């Protein structure tokens, strides 16, 4: 019996390895209804880097219903959105060189995908982070929290 339990544990450990590796990335989708399919993302402190894979699952073009994924401290979100509107679509609705932006994808149209990888060292335990779409008017609905966890 002990050998069976031990063997089962070894088998579970072998199958969990890919799952553990996948914890340093997340897939997230944005729709034509101005929604992300996730409202919260947890990033393990054990990750050196974290990757966000964004897919726009809608059909509308980027100039009509474009979506991106932007990460900032929660306190910076509104100012980043405001400055992004002035920057325009050609700049991904983000002010050039904005140090408040910790990571972002490009603005996507329906059917498009993009990824961004960032250093987890940019995040501090206890700080509040928000991810959102910076396309004008989208941030009110298309946002969520990102949290650094053990």
Curated annotation (Swiss-Prot):
Molecular function GO labels: copper ion binding; electron transfer activity
Record-listed Cu cation binding positions: 67, 133, 138, 142
Domain of life: Bacteria
A Pfam family it matches: Copper-bind
Major subcellular location class: periplasm
Localisation: Periplasm
Any one GO cellular component localisation term in the record: periplasmic space
Residue ranges of domain Plastocyanin-like in the record: 22-150
Keywords: Copper, Disulfide bond, Electron transport, Metal-binding, Periplasm, Signal, Transport
S-S bonds: 24-47
Name of the protein this chain belongs to: Azurin
Native organism taxonomy: Bacteria, Pseudomonadati, Pseudomonadota, Betaproteobacteria, Burkholderiales
């Amino acid at each position: 019996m002990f050998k069976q339990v031990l063997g089962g544990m070894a088998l579970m450990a072998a199958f969990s390895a890919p799952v553990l590796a996948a914890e340093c990335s997340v897939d997230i989708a944005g729709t034509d209804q101005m929604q992300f399919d996730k409202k919260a993302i947890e990033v393990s402190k054990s990750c050196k880097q974290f990757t966000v894979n964004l897919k726009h699952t809608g059909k509308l073009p980027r100039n009509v219903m474009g979506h991106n994924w932007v990460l900032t401290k929660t306190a910076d979100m509104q100012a980043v959105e405001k400055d992004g509107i002035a920057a325009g679509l050609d700049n991904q609705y983000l002010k050039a060189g904005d140090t408040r932006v910790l990571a972002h994808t490009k603005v996507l149209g329906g059917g498009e995908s993009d990824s961004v990888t960032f250093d987890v060292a940019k995040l501090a335990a206890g700080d509040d982070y928000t991810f959102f779409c910076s396309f004008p008017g989208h941030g009110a609905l298309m946002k969520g929290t990102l949290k650094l966890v053990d």
